[in-house]
Amino acid sequence: MSRIGKKPISVPSGVTATVEGQLVKAKGPKGELSYLVNDEVLVKLEESFISVSPRDQSKDARSKWGMSRSMIENIFCGVKDGFEKRLEINGVGYRAALQGKDIQLSLGFSHDVIYKVPSGVTVSIPKPTEIVVSGIDKQQVGQVAAEIREYRRPEPYKGKGIKHADERIFRKEGKKK
């Protein structure tokens, strides 16, 4: 029994939800998203709630039950409030700048790294050492933040690199003589 899947999903105020077969659509103030639910899972719209249940008691259906509920809840949160990831840049001379829609990253390489931001995601740089990635699709926002972080992951000795704002870097001690 999925503890997450059992809970009904309430449709937030300001968001309209429709269920067409296995396709769940949500439209809100930030935009419009849809999610195609797996065939193993049954979706029902009842007034201002959406309930998700497995079609049968197979292991495959039960394993996709909770995930489907979470994905539907994420599209509701996305079209209502949106999602945001903050990245911090640590290191001497490491900085970021916007070049039109692209990000120019100076990360200690012999060249600057240019990252092309995909559509559906907005990037702002409040400070040269801070990047804010925001959008309505949680998966896409997280993917863009992970791709930017991958250019220079934080290293454990000095902590230089790009890290998530809430990430804690495990620091190591250097060599001893």
UniProtKB/Swiss-Prot annotation:
Signal peptide: none annotated. The keyword RNA-binding applies. PROSITE patterns: RIBOSOMAL_L6_1 (PS00525). One of its GO terms (cellular component) is cytosolic large ribosomal subunit. GO terms for biological process: cytoplasmic translation. Keywords: Ribonucleoprotein, Ribosomal protein, RNA-binding, rRNA-binding. One of its GO terms (molecular function) is rRNA binding. InterPro entries: Ribosomal_uL6-like, Ribosomal_uL6-like_a/b-dom_sf, Ribosomal_uL6_a/b-dom, Ribosomal_uL6_bac-type, Ribosomal_uL6_CS. Pfam families: Ribosomal_L6 (PF00347). HAMAP family: Ribosomal_uL6_B (MF_01365_B). Part of the 50S ribosomal subunit. NCBIfam families: L6_bact. Belongs to the universal ribosomal protein uL6 family. This protein binds to the 23S rRNA, and is important in its secondary structure. It is located near the subunit interface in the base of the L7/L12 stalk, and near the tRNA binding site of the peptidyltransferase center. This is Large ribosomal subunit protein uL6. It comes from Bartonella henselae (strain ATCC 49882 / DSM 28221 / CCUG 30454 / Houston 1) (Rochalimaea henselae). The lineage of its organism: Bacteria, Pseudomonadati, Pseudomonadota, Alphaproteobacteria, Hyphomicrobiales. The gene is rplF.
